[in-house]
């Protein structure tokens, strides 16, 4: 029989090297797509409920802040849900740093949003800065319809496999 220390030594010898070149940096929404469970707890029906809750939290934040008084949820099909409110709408003007519409920044960049300080919302629910971008990352298709500043904006985002 083999001793424990020599067995452990054999395992160690068989392992390949582990160096800085093995360290990955995931960007954009890639971390969510690779490890959805880290963000929504899994990939089962409860995870889908979590995604719905993230969108609903945004509508409820508008209600609690006094900017909306109506939220509608519609089950369109087994895997499609519509959530709407009469709140302010996601900003669509260009973000000062990224030079693209703020809605695009919010939908495609983790840790972006208007809830980190108390300037926009005194209280808020959900995963601040990751909620709606996680929903986008894990949705086959996500359509935003935003009525803001007397204009109507529509943007459809689709899951693309490269």
Report each predicted region and the residues it spans.
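Acidic ATP/Mg2+-coordinating residue in the GHKL
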Residues: 85
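Conserved ATP-binding N-box helix of the HATPase_c
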Residues: 46-67, 131-136
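Conserved short strand/loop->alpha-helix "switch" segment adjacent to the catalytic nucleotide/phosphoryl-transfer site
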Residues: 34-52
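A conserved short beta-strand within the histidine kinase catalytic ATPase domain
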Residues: 69-75
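N-terminal amphipathic, basic-rich helices that act as targeting or association modules
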Residues: 19-26, 47
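Short beta-strand-loop-beta element adjacent to the nucleotide/active-site pocket used for signaling
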Residues: 76-82
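Single conserved hydrophobic/aromatic residue that forms the stacking wall/gate
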Residues: 1-12, 160-161
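Flexible ATP-lid and adjacent glycine-rich G1/G2 motifs of the Bergerat
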Residues: 40, 88-147
